[in-house]
Structures are given as structure tokens and as C-alpha cells.
Regions:
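Structural alpha/beta surface segment adjacent to cysteine/selenocysteine redox centers
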Residues: 45, 54-140, 183, 215
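Proline-centered helix-kink/hinge sites
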Residues: 50, 61, 191-192
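Functionally engaged cysteine thiol sites
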Residues: 18, 22, 95-96, 165, ...
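A short beta-strand-turn-helix
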Residues: 21-39
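C-terminal cap of thioredoxin/glutaredoxin-like
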Residues: 9-10, 14, 46, 138-218
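Short pre-active-site segment immediately N-terminal to redox-active cysteine/selenocysteine motifs
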Residues: 40, 45-48, 81, 189
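N-terminal secretory signal peptides
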Residues: 39-43, 50-54, 217
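N-terminal targeting signals for export/organelle localization
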Residues: 1-23, 218
């Protein structure tokens, strides 16, 4: 009877929220979710891609809530860099601790219209600076012109830390390698999604969620 009372009064077991489980893969991509989940959705992304920003705004949080948080699916972000602005933002986001990647990733895509407008309106002399010198020189110039130092500063990254990452191949080379690997496989547009290694025709949030609804078992 005493055991029954203890059992009755015990708190129910807490289910784990797997969106707090972020890891970095051997190739430098970022993975969120249950490491034992059988299903994996991969997104090949560019930070200067309008459809990528639309997916982040319209479907990413719902996808994480329904499939990642519950442990049913893992979600991986790989880069398919399109230009020096994209490379600079990707390097900056990779400069953060692994646990902060998806927060900053989402923030940069959701605010894309603001900082990309600065890049689009850059003068010829500004754009010339983006092409001159070392990778560090180029990315520092872009970061200054689009306000990246301030944006990533909100995530705890100092200017000197970001500058160090711009000059560190250990930070930016995996992004370049992911891009080369994607290109070799014929992935030239973004976003491109793969579910368990099978490329999807879907690129919109609505279509991706429809595929997941029919493919991921509860």
C-alpha cells in the first residue's frame, strides 16, 4: 500500500525535447534532434536565397515542433554557398558555439530582407573590397558593409572573435567543402531537401511539410 501511495504521488516522467540536442558532424554540418531517429531531413541552404528564408519563416519551426522535438526525425543543415556575402554570413554563424548554431541560423534567414538589402545596394567600390585580398580581408569588408558584426554580437560574438574566424580555414573550409560536395552531386539550387538520402522535389514549407506528414511514422 505504501508503495502504491509513492507511485501515485510520483511525478510523471518528462519527455525529452530534442531541439536542444545540437551536434556538429564530421563534415562540419550541423544536426539537430534525436541521434537515434531513423529519419533525417537535410537542407542545402544559402543565406542569400529568398526561398531559404521563406522556408525558415513559414515552415522550420513547425517542422521542428512536430518532428524534431518529438524525437521522430533529425534535421541537418548543409551549405551550398552562392557568393561572398553568403560565405561571410555562413562563416560568421559557424564561428558561434555549436549549441547556438540553429538560433543564429534562423535569425539570419528571418532578417535576410534587412541585411541583404544593404548588400544589394553596395557601391562598386564596396564590392571591389569584397574581392580583394585574403579570405579574411574579403569577409571583414562584407561584414562591415552589411552590419554582420552587430547582428552576431547579439548572439555573444565579439568583433575580434569574428575576425579571427574569418582568417581561420578550420572555420570556413568545411563550408567550402560542403558547397563543393553539393555541386559535385548536381545540387545547384537552394533550398534543396533530401529525406533519408532521397532528393525531394519540394522546396516550399507547405510541400516539405506535406512530404514529412506522409513519410514520417508516428
Amino acid at each position: 500500500a505504501f508503495a502504491a501511495v509513492l507511485a501515485f504521488g510520483a511525478a510523471p516522467p518528462q519527455s525529452k525535447n530534442f531541439v536542444t540536442n545540437v551536434t556538429r558532424t564530421a563534415t562540419g554540418s550541423h544536426l539537430i534532434g534525436n541521434p537515434e531517429a531513423k529519419d533525417t531531413l537535410v537542407e542545402f541552404v544559402s543565406y542569400t536565397c529568398g526561398h531559404c528564408a521563406a522556408f525558415e519563416r513559414e515552415g522550420a519551426e513547425l517542422m521542428k515542433a512536430q518532428y524534431v522535438a518529438t524525437g521522430r526525425m533529425k534535421f541537418e543543415v548543409r551549405h551550398r554557398v552562392l557568393n561572398v556575402v553568403d560565405m561571410t554570413v555562413a562563416t560568421g554563424v559557424h564561428c558561434l558555439p555549436t549549441a547556438k548554431f540553429f538560433t543564429a541560423h534562423s535569425a539570419m534567414l528571418r532578417s535576410q530582407d534587412k541585411w541583404l538589402a544593404k548588400a544589394s545596394s553596395a557601391t562598386a567600390s564596396q564590392q571591389a573590397r569584397w574581392k580583394a585580398g585574403t579570405p579574411r580581408d574579403k569577409m571583414r569588408a562584407v561584414a562591415s558593409d552589411i552590419g554582420l558584426y552587430d547582428m552576431l554580437g547579439r548572439h555573444g560574438l565579439s568583433r575580434s572573435q569574428l575576425d579571427n574566424c574569418f582568417g581561420d580555414p578550420a572555420v570556413y573550409q568545411p563550408i567550402t567543402d560542403q558547397t563543393a560536395a553539393a555541386s559535385k552531386r548536381g545540387i545547384n539550387g537552394t533550398p534543396t531537401f533530401e529525406l533519408n538520402g532521397v532528393r525531394l522535389a519540394a522546396i516550399t514549407a507547405r510541400d516539405v511539410l506535406f512530404v514529412l506528414e506522409n513519410a514520417i511514422k508516428r
